[in-house]
Amino acid sequence: MKTLFNLTLLLVFSHPLFAQKVIREKIFSAKMKKEISTIIVTPDIKPHQQYKTVYILHGYSGNPERTLKQDIPDLQAKAKAYNTIYILPDGNYNSWYVDSPVDQKSQYKTFIGSELVRYIDEHYPTKAEKTSRGILGWSMGGFGSLYIGTSFPEAFGIVGSSCGALDFRTFNEDYNNYQVDKVLGPLSSLGSEYILSDNTDKMLNTGQYYILDCGINDFFISKNQSFHQDLLTKKVEHLYIESLGEHNTEYWSRALSNQLSLFENYFNHR
């Protein structure tokens, strides 16, 4: 059945009217027992060809439609130029991309790292291997990409974070303002699993490559700098970039575009 479905999909994509597409799907999560809105941006799909995939995680209060229109407005052009399929799941405004211990309807780590990857590989002509699959996000999505990427090292070969919210312990009152408590409970009982700097050992010997960037005027800059130092101390191979910019669309739109080109360079050398 899968072979027949994939053949049908390939024939549809090869039709001139379906050469390059922005596809909107409702993808069912068995873990959450609900459908998740997801946008898939494809290049010009050709018969008998398989494509790299990058999963893109939006920031707090964002959504895939905003990503296409504002955050990475040239994503369709990049899909065509890089021959890559981009997958944009809806992170539900404030999921923080975790498997919430307090809300069973918010299990986004499993959905994105396992269920969604499996669905995309079954329904699209992908290169179903970690060296052809990446995950990237900014702000809340920067945390999510590192958290999910390191939780599923067998799935993702390259992991990128732009202006990532990397340490909840520094949020203070913003821990509740940004609704982290809705998915992880009170800050006072935050588990070490959700503190990225406590888990850098798991980033060793995974065969993954990591890219982090942050604007020098971003309120998250100090934690990105300290996380970079943690990785250096542990000798975790990564690329760290600082440049002019604040925590806003102007910065991360530019930074994400740069990261996607670095992702392409990674894929081409594997």
List the predicted regions and their residue ranges.
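Non-catalytic cap/lid and distal C-terminal segments of serine-dependent acyl enzymes
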Residues: 20-270
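Bacterial Sec-dependent N-terminal signal peptides
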Residues: 1-22
